[in-house]
Amino acid sequence: MTIIDGFNRFESKAPPRWLDTITHVFFPERCLFCREVLSSSEGRPICRSCSNGFSPVGLICPACENIIIGKSSCLCQSSFSYLQSLFALSYYVGQWRFLLHNLKYYKRRSLARPLGRWLGLEIITRQFCQPDVIVSIPLHIFREKERGFNQSSLIASYTARTIGKRHLPLLNKTIDTISQTTLSRRERFENIRNVFSSNKILPQGTEVMLIDDIYSTGSTMKEAAKVLSSSGAKVHGAVIAYNPLIK
């Protein structure tokens, strides 16, 4: 039995399926963008009208952070040893920025379900990777108590449920850092250095999908991936939104 098989304390914050079902009966799911009631046949949490023309950002090169077209490798032919691949659902603009801002700062936890499920559906459709386990970027315990929840953990819980994998707490954030929001690219990497830890040793080659809400410079995800890699994992990243403006 591996450590993953024997891990009893799941991090998943998603409510039980029966509660989701009852909630959907009395409060039908609505389009994330226009709020139209969705039919039960809808896959993505947006209506057909809003989904016209939408295409996920897709694969991003972890080394040069350019978009990878098709399934070929990036033209830069570089590699980032800790992060094997990276998938983004959208760009951090417009309505996507509004949704994530409301989830994170205005505590609209209900947004985590459709966002996490949508990410999971796209991962399945595009056969992004076949992870053994889902892990989310952790908050420091003081920051999570202050906010009341971890938005990345909530999103990851629903993504894990959608793709049928477990969401496990394999990472801890041991230092309560200042916000990355106003920092430059260089400052972000310095701010997040050596702030994550893990006391779990994984079977060599365990495929881990590391989930966060936003990828900007990649400083947070790459630092977390470094820790998971040192524990024996092969790490793939997946995010709701990609913000390529900070270089």
Question: Which ranges hold each PLM region?
Answer:
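Glycine-rich phosphate/pyrophosphate-handling loop used in enzymes and phosphotransfer proteins
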Residues: 1-247
